[in-house]
């Protein structure tokens, strides 16, 4: 089986930023799990994880928020979080002037 998802970088500040912008964009969002959390969840479900392939995915801010019909007040809150992000967070997510950013994703091969 293949599982593909956005993954948290794990480190507290970067994780908090990711979870915050995801929740503001989509109030039904639960959590972006780290690679370690995914591996543990799959193991608990009886899977043995083989290969894990990671990549970075650029998110166009306007498209990303439009897909979920994010209300304008929440779009502005996301922009405010991005503007206030630490250098470490801003660099990790490669936050651009228009709000676009890059996130981590992983593909898990499990049997």
Locate each region found by the language model:
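Conserved class I S-adenosyl-L-methionine
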Residues: 2-29
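Conserved Class I S-adenosyl-L-methionine
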Residues: 36-39, 43-111
